[in-house]
Every structure is written in structure tokens, then in C-alpha cells.
């Protein structure tokens, strides 16, 4: 009996030690992951706060001056081209490109994402209502930057394997000749594929999974499977199917969300004047608003407002030129004018409406942020339907972004490896969408932000190097 007891204790001790080793490995992995996430977040903060915010805004100011406030002089042209080309059933995209409206819709599909809902709420909590003013400022100058991007994308587009294509990877090579230009183009393509095609789409899938789980109690894995299947079906149809979906989805989702916001603002009409007072006052004198967001400085309002504007409309990041390159237009300036409208719709319409709903709700100082704050603000007017409304909008916004980002990644994947491997890229993206719906994606968010910043650097350098080309084309505009 003593012998058997001794063997049992020894076995238990051995098993316990093995369990300890397994636990040590798991716990060590968690600590390493947390530490790595923190390192990436700190690197991303340094990249964005000390380089990109100044470079992006500075580039916008530079092009605004060089192009003589093109965002104002070409705005009417953009509106005219928008209504001239608007159609929910336009001619199908083909090897020669797509219609100007389809290109704009694909660009806006990427621009108008979950950041217009959750990101706006986070910016207002962190930077106060005054952050919206600085979002407007960054978007105003960003219009000039995105005009330059679209013009260059049109100018340096090319044909690969019988399909018209273009984007920063192509005009970067034109800006910087030789090995350096090739290196920057490859660097940009790799950063974009990682930031948008893979990790970015993982985050978008996660946003949809969270929204539907919170609103309806649906299992996140089920949501991921449905989104992945829908995405795969559209991906397999190529640019033709993506353009056909975005030209219908973007106007419908924008109108649906705008109507919801307008209803709330009509109900809260008496609070709108004070909301604008807060926006303009808190942008310069945060301490002047009693009972407002405590401890928010002018610097914080500026930082979070500018960052949200740049993240939202993507002007200067080098993403939307891939769509604008495919537009069938008479001259590059026409698509440049339409690109300006994309920033206007994203920031001055949709994001601004979200901000006004949040500010007039009076909930910003209540300690909530992100999706929770937005859902609470909409629920004040819509009741329990508020969560459902936001979940539906998150589905529209995030799924449209998945389509846009997939396409941008595909262009760069094909530039690196050739179109014969497109299905491999599609499969990888679908897997990331499926996995992302149910995972905690803090590290993925951090990596996506970091690579987003990295891809912007060569794009902005190329824009500045080719500024003379942009100015020359802008001067030669024909009515």
C-alpha cells in the first residue's frame, strides 16, 4: 500500500510539474505578446505623432498653395462629374477600367469605415468636441493631397496582363528612378498588403462580429463565416464584381446612415447651436467650457482631431489612388476633382454628422467611448433599436471597407507576384476575415496602424517629388 501511494504521489508530482511547464509557456507567451503589442503601439505613436501628422498636413498645405486652393476651385467640377456619372447600374468594369463613379464608390467604400462611427467617438472623448474643428482643418488640406494622388494615379497608370492598373507603386517608380525607386515601390506594396489586405480586413471583420454579438447575441464565429463567404464570392468576381457591388452599396449605406443621424439631430435641434459653440471654443480654449471634457488641452484637441481626419479620409496614405487609377475619364483632373468629393463625403458629411449626434447627446463626459458611446447616443432617440441601427451600419461600413482594402491589396500583390497568384491572395484575405471575427485583435490593430504609417511615407515623398507634374496637369485643365 505504501509503495502504491508513493508511486501515485510521484506521478502526481510529475504531472503537476508538466502542467507547470505548460502554464509557464502559455503565460510567458501571453506576456511576450503583451510586451510586443506595447512596443508596436509605442513605435506607431512615435511614427504618427512625430512624423506623419506633420508630413501629411504639411503636404496638404503645400499642394493647397501650389495648386491655388484646388479643393475650392475644382469642387464644383467634382459635384458635376459626380451627378453626371452617378448610376446604381453602371456599365460593368472591364480590362480597360471602370466608370468614374464606380472608382469613386470603391474609394469611398474604403474611406467610410468603422472609424466614422467608433473612431469619431474615441477622438471626441480623447480630444473633446474641439477635435472636430481640427478634423475639418486636416480634411480641407487633405483634399488637395488626394487630388494630387488621383491625378498621378491616372497619369502613371499602366496595363499589366491585359488589365489597366495603377497606384502609388507605379508613380513612386516614376518619381525615383533606379534601384531606390524600385525599393520604395516594393516597400510601399508590402506595407499596404499587410496593413490593409491582411491585418486591416481582420480588424474590420472583428468590428462586425462585435457589433452583431452585442446587438443580437449572434456567435462571432458564425458572423465571421457569413462575412468570409460573402467576401469570397465577390473577390472571385474580380474588379468587375467589386465595382458592381460598391456602386450600389456605398450610396445606400451612406443614405441610410445620414437619414438616421438627421432624425436624431432634428429631435435635438435645440442643442445644435451649443454644439457648434463647443466645437469652435474647445478647439482653442478648452478651459472656457464649464462641465465639458476635463483636462483636455488645445494640443490634445488638435492631435486627436487631425489624426482622426487623416485616418478617416485616407488622404495621403496611398490607398484610394488604386481605385482612381482605373476610372475612365477624359483627363486626370476630372478624377482628381471627384477624389475631392470623396474626402468631403467622408469627413464633412458622415463623420461630422456622427460627431454632432454624439455632442448633442451630452454623453461624452460620461466615461463611455467607441462603439458603446455611439450606441448609447443613438439609443437616446431610437431606444433599443439604437444598437440594431449601429450594428447594421457597422456591417455596411466595415464590409465596404473590406472590399476596398482587398482590391487595393490585390493591385499591389499582383505588382509583386503577378496576376496568376491572385487566388492565393484572395484565400489568405478570406482566412484573415474568418479568424478576425472572433479574436481579440489589439496587436493586429497596432500592427495595422504601424504599417499604415509606413506605407504613407514613400507615397508622400513621391507626391512631393512629382508636384511639378501635378501642377502642370492642373493648369492644363479643359472644360
Where does each model-flagged region fall?
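Alpha-helical membrane segments and immediately flanking helix-loop junctions
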Residues: 88-126, 152-155, 160-175, 190-193, ...
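Transmembrane-helix boundary/entry motifs in multi-pass membrane transporters
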Residues: 82-104, 139, 150, 154-195, ...
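Membrane-interface loop-to-helix entry segments
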Residues: 10, 55-59, 70-79, 188, ...
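Extracellular/periplasmic helix-exit of transmembrane alpha-helices
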Residues: 147-161, 262-278, 286-293, 326-329, ...
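Helix-loop-helix module between adjacent transmembrane segments
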Residues: 63-64, 138-162, 173-206, 210-234, ...
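Transmembrane helix-loop junctions in multi-pass membrane proteins
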Residues: 35-36, 66-71, 115-120, 196-208, ...
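N-terminal alpha-helical transmembrane segments of multi-pass membrane transport
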Residues: 25-109, 114, 125-130, 142, ...
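Selective recognition of specific alpha-helical transmembrane segments in multi-pass small-molecule
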Residues: 141-149, 225-239, 250-270, 303, ...
Amino acid at each position: 500500500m505504501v509503495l502504491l501511494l508513493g508511486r501515485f504521489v510521484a506521478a502526481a508530482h510529475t504531472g503537476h510539474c508538466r502542467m507547470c511547464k505548460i502554464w509557464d509557456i502559455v503565460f510567458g507567451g501571453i506576456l511576450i505578446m503583451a510586451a510586443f503589442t506595447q512596443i508596436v503601439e509605442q513605435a506607431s505613436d512615435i511614427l504618427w505623432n512625430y512624423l506623419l501628422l506633420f508630413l501629411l498636413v504639411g503636404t496638404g498645405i503645400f499642394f493647397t498653395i501650389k495648386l491655388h486652393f484646388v479643393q475650392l476651385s475644382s469642387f464644383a467640377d467634382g459635384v458635376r462629374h459626380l451627378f453626371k456619372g452617378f448610376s446604381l447600374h453602371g456599365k460593368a468594369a472591364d480590362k480597360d477600367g471602370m466608370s468614374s463613379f464606380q472608382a469613386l464608390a470603391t474609394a469611398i467604400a474604403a474611406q467610410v469605415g468603422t472609424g466614422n462611427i467608433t473612431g469619431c467617438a474615441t477622438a471626441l472623448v480623447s480630444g473633446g468636441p474641439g477635435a472636430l474643428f481640427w478634423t475639418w482643418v486636416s480634411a480641407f488640406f487633405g483634399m488637395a493631397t488626394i487630388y494630387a494622388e488621383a491625378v498621378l494615379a491616372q497619369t502613371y497608370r499602366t496595363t499589366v496582363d491585359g488589365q489597366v492598373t495603377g497606384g502609388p507603386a507605379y508613380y513612386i517608380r516614376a518619381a525615383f528612378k533606379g534601384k531606390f525607386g524600385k525599393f520604395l515601390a516594393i516597400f510601399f506594396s508590402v506595407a499596404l498588403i499587410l496593413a490593409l489586405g491582411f491585418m486591416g480586413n481582420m480588424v474590420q471583420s472583428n468590428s462586425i462580429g462585435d457589433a452583431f454579438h452585442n446587438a443580437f447575441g449572434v456567435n462571432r464565429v458564425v458572423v465571421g463565416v457569413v462575412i468570409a463567404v460573402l467576401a469570397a464570392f465577390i473577390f472571385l468576381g474580380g474588379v468587375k464584381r467589386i465595382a458592381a457591388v460598391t456602386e450600389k452599396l456605398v450610396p445606400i449605406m451612406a443614405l441610410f446612415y445620414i437619414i438616421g443621424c438627421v432624425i436624431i439631430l432634428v429631435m435635438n435641434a435645440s442643442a445644435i447651436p451649443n454644439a457648434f459653440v463647443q466645437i469652435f471654443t474647445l478647439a482653442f480654449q478648452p478651459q472656457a467650457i464649464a462641465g465639458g471634457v476635463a483636462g483636455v488641452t488645445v494640443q490634445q484637441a488638435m492631435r486627436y482631431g487631425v489624426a482622426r481626419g487623416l485616418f478617416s479620409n485616407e488622404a495621403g496614405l496611398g490607398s484610394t489612388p488604386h481605385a482612381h487609377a482605373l476610372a475612365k475619364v477624359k483627363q486626370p483632373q476630372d478624377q482628381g476633382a471627384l477624389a475631392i468629393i470623396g474626402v468631403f463625403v467622408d469627413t464633412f458629411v458622415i463623420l461630422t454628422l456622427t460627431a454632432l449626434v454624439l455632442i448633442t447627446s451630452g454623453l461624452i463626459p460620461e466615461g463611455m467611448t467607441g462603439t458603446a458611446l455611439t450606441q448609447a447616443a443613438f439609443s437616446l432617440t431610437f431606444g433599443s433599436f439604437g444598437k440594431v441601427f449601429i450594428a447594421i451600419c457597422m456591417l455596411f461600413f466595415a464590409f465596404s471597407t473590406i472590399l476596398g482594402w482587398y482590391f487595393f491589396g490585390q493591385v499591389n500583390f499582383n505588382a509583386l507576384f503577378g496576376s496568376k497568384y491572385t487566388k492565393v491572395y484572395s484565400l489568405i484575405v478570406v482566412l484573415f476575415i474568418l479568424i478576425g471575427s472572433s479574436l481579440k485583435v489589439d496587436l493586429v490593430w497596432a500592427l495595422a496602424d504601424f504599417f499604415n504609417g509606413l506605407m504613407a511615407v514613400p507615397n508622400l515623398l513621391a507626391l512631393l517629388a512629382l508636384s511639378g507634374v501635378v501642377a502642370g496637369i492642373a493648369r492644363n485643365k479643359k472644360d
